[in-house]
């Protein structure tokens, strides 16, 4: 029998925020992207941010490589699997009346396909999904701010859940509470993190415990 995790002091603050925004790849889904291979296929220097590099290229070349990136990500979409606890978490939040959205460095079209594929598409209307062509890519807070504005609120009413530094920086800059999901438990960016968990299963358990104590 596993020991119940003691509630984190930040959990009541998370539950008080009626808008939750998720990263998709590696957060709601298990990681499938081989970024080194993608960089090689696109000619992006090792260690460089893929989108940032493509945007520095001449327009015709940038457009061509963005198209190739779209093809790669469309192929990966068919292999996506829900991360542990993803369905449990979004179901618990939905029952609470939380409004949910996605801010991803993928495209909206791929995101819609992935979310349907992993069985959570009904929780995320198309208008609540912002991809790299809909807002400035993370770590810019633009995606969160745009979603919040469309909901008639601000980033300070939101929670941002993600697995990478850019997600946390994006959330912090927008005024959102940030949740870092890290399967390795390294938790490398505490300065940008309000709550750290190893999985969405763990986060779902904390949310359910918090609700039961209200």
Model-derived segments and spans:
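Active-site neighborhood of HAD-like aspartate-dependent phosphohydrolases
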Residues: 1-61
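Asp-based, Mg2+/Mn2+-dependent phosphohydrolase catalytic module
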Residues: 1-18, 108, 114-214
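Short hydrophobic segments within beta-strands
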Residues: 23-24, 103, 161, 181
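A general structural signal for well-ordered alpha-helical segments in protein cores
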Residues: 35, 50-51, 62, 66, ...
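Hydrophobic alpha-helical core bundles mediating ligand binding, dimerization, or RNAP-core interactions
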Residues: 35-42, 70-73, 111-114
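Short, acidic loop-to-helix structural element flanking the phosphoryl-transfer center
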Residues: 75-102, 108-112, 141
